[in-house]
């Protein structure tokens, strides 16, 4: 919400559906207007949302969409930008195929904060699916401008022979990842499968203990034959 306020977007919240930890998709569809530009689903506790349903909704509402920049025009509908802060490593079942969650929405953001499954102490990552008419390098450079005061070169490229000169082309933010943080993340990646396995073992113990109490919990494990949920990452037990 804070980042949206910084760019003066107008926000509209969609509540969760009854007896669910996902948004009310009917309310989502009803909330889309001619002014809607982006939907930000939240993968709470590492469990992916029903992205097939979300994409069906934005396709049905396509006639209402009025793009305001070149990327929006290229995508041609409301953008789906997933908040996957909890879901690094989660996967999603689509047409019988397992897709990693960073390749489901148009854009996907991950958090590597200290309390997440994979941590670099602070920081995160962002992924996107190919956008017709836009080179990935161009999209990457736009994010680099946003993350380093609008500078046209990052620290690595400034250090090259004769590469000291750069421009500041926009008033942007300072949220680039340091080499030290990246090094921590690389080690975490090597350990990640084992970390997820350990979390699964712990959650199985919780499930066994809570089952007789009749408590409603997030479906940390699900039938892989279900349409949209495959394998969550389980950073939280709710």
Residue ranges of predicted features:
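Active-site PLP attachment segment
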Residues: 86-88, 103-152, 179-182
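Conserved active-site segment immediately N-terminal to the catalytic lysine
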Residues: 68-118, 164-168
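PLP-dependent aminotransferase class I/II
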Residues: 38-42, 47-55, 131-237
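Short, glycine/charged-enriched secondary-structure capping and boundary segments
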Residues: 29, 53-56, 93-100, 123-125
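Structural signal for conserved beta-strand scaffold positions within catalytic alpha/beta enzyme cores
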Residues: 13-15, 110, 220
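Ser/Thr-centric signal marking residues that sit
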Residues: 33-36, 119, 233
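PLP-dependent aminotransferase-like
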Residues: 1-89
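Short, function-defining helix-loop hinge/capping sites that tune catalysis or transport
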Residues: 23, 51, 90-94, 121, ...
